[in-house]
């Protein structure tokens, strides 16, 4: 089953993107370089959990 995750900027801490991830095949934390509109440059974005409520 694919879970929805948010991608949080490593520098400013804002959640700018969201995507899905298959936890069976990718067991580590997801890290990718993406553009942060707050800082106006490419930074590392790390996986965070979206609360279901």
Swiss-Prot record:
Q: Matching InterPro entries, A to Z? A: Ribosomal_bL33, Ribosomal_bL33_CS, Ribosomal_bL33_sf, Ribosomal_zn-bd
One cellular component term (GO) for this entry is:
ribosome
Q: Which terms does the UniProt entry file under GO BP?
A: translation
Q: Which Pfam families match?
A: Ribosomal_L33
Q: List where this protein forms a coiled coil.
A: none
Q: Which top-level group of life is the source organism from?
A: Bacteria
Keywords, in A-Z order: Ribonucleoprotein, Ribosomal protein
Molecular-function GO terms, alphabetical: structural constituent of ribosome
The Swiss-Prot or TrEMBL record describes its family as follows: Belongs to the bacterial ribosomal protein bL33 family.
Q: What is this protein called?
A: Large ribosomal subunit protein bL33B
Instruction: Point out the gene that encodes the protein.
Output: rpmG2
């Amino acid at each position: 089953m694919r879970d929805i995750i948010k991608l949080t900027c490593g520098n400013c801490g804002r959640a700018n993107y969201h995507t899905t991830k298959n936890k069976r095949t990718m067991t580590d934390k997801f890290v990718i370089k993406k553009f942060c509109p707050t800082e106006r440059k490419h930074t590392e974005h790390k996986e965070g959990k979206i609360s279901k409520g």
